[in-house]
């Protein structure tokens, strides 16, 4: 799984940043969108985002104009690590998601856990799946098992900040 982890996570080459220091998450994300735009020729592209939290990545996906449909799976409950770090409640997180995504009509929120809604998505129907939900090994592995069949042939899967312990 360690080799698979490196393959599925978007690890852009450092030289792409042009030596610019700053928010590497943002730079990496915009670089990923640039590459996705080249790799997904379908103008009717569809994606699933597992774990949307406050909708910041969702907003960037929607702003990219790559995806006609973005399906977000977010229960707005669960791991408390970030909420405790930044003193947020889940209601505040959900409200921020709504604020961040309010101007986009191509976003559908599925307010639930991925294991409860995975059967709502057809197999071989999605161009891109982005996994950023629960970050422990078993949860990521289960998301991969449940959602890999949802990808079209030559579809792309990516993710963000999976657990460092594996």
Walk through the language-model features, giving the residues of each:
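A short alpha-helical cap/connector motif
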Residues: 1-166
